[in-house]
Amino acid sequence: MKAKLRVQRHQKISEIDERLYGSFIEHLGRAVYNGIYEPTHETADAEGFRNDVKQLVKELNVPLVRYPGGNFVSGYKWEDSVGPKENRPRKVDLAWRTIETNQVGVHEFAKWAKEVDTEVNMAVNLGTRGIQEAMELLEYCNFEGGTYWSDLRKEHGTEKPFGFKTWCLGNEMDGPWQIGHKTAEEYGRLAAETAKAMKLVDDSIELVVCGSSSSKMPTFGDWERVVLEHTYEYVDYLSLHCYYGNPENNLGNYLAQSLDMDQFIKTVVSICDYVKVKKGSDKQINLSFDEWNVWYHSNEQDAAMEPWQIAPPLLEDIYNFEDALLIGCLLITLLKNSDRVKIACLAQLVNVIAPIMTENDGETWKQTIFYPFMHVSNHGRGVVLTPSVESDSYSVEGFKHVPYLETIATYNEENNELVIFAVNRSQEETLEFVFEQEGFEFESIIEETAMEGFDVKATNAAAAEVVKPSIVQKATIADNQLTTSLSPLSWNVIRIKVK
């Protein structure tokens, strides 16, 4: 089967905001405790954070991490997480029905973030709390000094402000499961007033307002419209959340789910632009897709979990090869929409629906989904080139005209590198792939990488990381175009030196 991608040097979708490759750490399960933080581990640093985990986070090259939630934040009292550790209270976390020790808080997480070269995307509690508490947290984190909260930060050991620049106004407030769930009208009013107050404290921050927690929510669409009508002038981004799964074991349908993500994004963009026109505004609201991933493997295990434990193993999906293929498709979809999606957070980062897994007192290991994310985060920099794709397609329940080839190309002018990311969705046929371009001169193929040939249900484990990429040498360059073969059910990365 033949397939083709064409690009032109000067036809671009957008520059890539590096925050597109963000992630998420929530006080949930073993994400924090026995995840990034395990003071008794042999690799633990002076603060108690595992150096082996830090190394894997650095490999992923994550520029931004959302924190501390998630559902958790809607019951969070941030003051419990600062000051001497021995004085911090243990509290019940109603979101996940566990016990929170508060041994990791604002200061510790900020230090960890600095160690792994990432920025903190801080969330405020608009479930059980409100404007005053959000202002005080921002003052504590970002104000230079000379006030009660900023001086308290100094007393707690941090002289200079943390300088967190991106803030989330609550989490999934449309969800009936959320502590302090609100209607769009209620949340829109609260978010607007909170945003106004926060920007009076620090006008350099950017704010993310809650969109729908899923495109399947009965209030989807109306929620976005009403919330934006209240907040449009005061916020910078609208959030989207979406998780995918394959409980019915329909691979063709599963690998087509990236089309659902694409439609979700385009629908939300339309709503943003409708409100812009309605308000007669010159301002453009962009998107923060700050929760996305595969999530369904652990549902049964989680339902049987005993409540009120400290750091129980919750949401520990073990990902397989087909999950890695879908993650590749979803990453390509985010790049295709990078003109409006400026922030995205793979949810989550460690142990909880995560690319990185740890054993208590033991090893770390990489899940199958680690690799596509690592490839795109490290090599998908610069600009996204507008794609023209020729590919046969298939139809499956819920989706018509699903292309066998899912692909995009990026160009990084700093290092003269053109990178092709491609998934072959076909379960049986190799794609004879041709890459045509205008405006570049090929110098050499830097590297061709593929994840291919695995059973779709194959997984990794601490004892054996079986599903991982290999260096291949199938691509050839002639007449300033590239040809290669993309194996059935494969994730492919081709890096080309150009001038």
Residue map of PLM features:
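Active-site His/acidic residue clusters
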Residues: 241-257
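Non-catalytic accessory regions flanking glycosidase/transglycosidase catalytic cores in CAZymes
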Residues: 1-223, 229-237, 261-262, 266-303, ...
